[in-house]
Amino acid sequence: MSRIGKKPVSLPQGVTATVNGQTVTAKGPKGELKFVVNDEVLVKMEGSEIAVQPRDQTKTARSKWGMSRTQIVNILHGVKDGFEKKLEITGVGYRAAMQGKNLQLALGFSHDVVYETPAGVTIAVPKPTEITVTGIDKQQVGQVAAEIREYRGPEPYKGKGVRYAGEKIVRKEGKKK
């Protein structure tokens, strides 16, 4: 039984939502997002709240119940406040810079890595060692941050590479003589 799925989702101030069949559409100050709920989950609007229920008591329907509610909460939060992921670059000569709409990364390769910014996401470089990814879609912001981190993930010996802000890297001890 989903404990999170039982709670109805209340609409934040300044956000309007509509439920049309299995599609939930949210409009807010930052933009508009749509989410198609799985067929095994029933979604309905009750006043200024969105209620999510499983269609039957099968294991798959109950497992998708809480996840559907959480994704609805995420689109409501996204159109109101948006989401942000911060990345840090550590290492000698490792740096980032914006080149038009593209992110240019110097990560110790023989060439610079150029990352094209997808639509719906904004990338900013406040310092050469910091990258900020912002957008209204939580999944897309996280995906872009993960793709940037994947170019040169933090290594365990010196901790060089691209990491999430606040991420702890488990360090290893080097070889001993």
UniProtKB/Swiss-Prot annotation:
GO annotations of cellular component type: cytosolic large ribosomal subunit
Keyword RNA-binding found: yes
Alphabetical UniProt keywords: Ribonucleoprotein, Ribosomal protein, RNA-binding, rRNA-binding
Superkingdom in the source lineage: Bacteria
Entries under InterPro entries matching the protein: Ribosomal_uL6-like, Ribosomal_uL6-like_a/b-dom_sf, Ribosomal_uL6_a/b-dom, Ribosomal_uL6_bac-type, Ribosomal_uL6_CS
GO biological process entries: cytoplasmic translation
TM regions (residue ranges): none
GO-annotated molecular function: rRNA binding; structural constituent of ribosome
PROSITE patterns: RIBOSOMAL_L6_1
Family under the similarity heading: Belongs to the universal ribosomal protein uL6 family.
Function (record text): This protein binds to the 23S rRNA, and is important in its secondary structure. It is located near the subunit interface in the base of the L7/L12 stalk, and near the tRNA binding site of the peptidyltransferase center.
Record text on subunit structure and interactions: Part of the 50S ribosomal subunit.
Record-given protein name: Large ribosomal subunit protein uL6
Organism of this sequence: Mesorhizobium japonicum (strain LMG 29417 / CECT 9101 / MAFF 303099)
Gene name in the database record: rplF
